Amino acid sequence: MGAKDVSEKILVAYSDVAADILNVLVCNGQRLFEPEMLQEASVVSQYKMDGKLHQQERDVAKFVIDKATNAIITCCGFENQTKVDNRMPLRVIGYDGASYHNQQNNAELYEVITFVLYFGERHWYAPRNLQGCINRRCDKLPDTVRNDYKINVYEIAYLTQEQIDMFQSDFKYVAEYMVQKRTNKEYQPSSGVIKHVDAVLKLLSAVSGNPNFELIIPDVEEGGLNTMDAMIARFEKRAEARGEARGLNIGENIANTNFATEMIKDGEPVSKIQKYTKLTLDRLEEIAKSLNVKLVM
């Protein structure tokens, strides 16, 4: 498992953060979930293919416990995505299916629901359901016999200010950063004390691609810093010391190039890539050449 993958999981694994995400993103701000209602669930499952046993791992999984009966009523999975995944519905089916498979001998079944937290600056352009992933179909079969499976994708960089203000956990600062990074290219942090300082900085480092967030952790811990504005001041001081540009700006051209690169790898057509990146055909051809692939026209 890569270090970046681990960093993305840490913050959401805290029950106060997971409950807050459910309350804001899923329940529109209603405080229906409490941290005490959530318990750790196994993120690892196994399946057999080609006669061999394989292992798959979710990012985070939480059981929702009924207070009255102490029974599991739901398993909530959380998947953190910094990039668009064209096969995300297939991954989610695999995770959810494994959770249902594990219940085969249970007297009663609980539901399994997965939430995809997408931290990219561009809209999620990939399929959000199984049928959107299918390329080959038998036209002799009616649609009524075809099964589908949708995924729940939440675009963190496109949350409204009203939604951001609803957050009561540290996830507020991550959402705030992603939205401001997309709209302003510069981050002006709000006030407030951060509870999970280490986890917030590691997640910001992972979703922004900027290692300075994680590199200031020793300074933050030594100085007892626990507010975002104080940590950003330390971040900028470190950036200046390394001769980097002040602030949290990312070059628009670099961002567009990186995004186009991922879309070209995914086999997306030129028209779709240009819609999201505004790059010229010549530039896209240069990127494709560097990847040793052909553009899809």
Cite the ranges covered by each PLM segment.
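Elongated, amphipathic alpha-helical interaction scaffolds
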Residues: 1-297
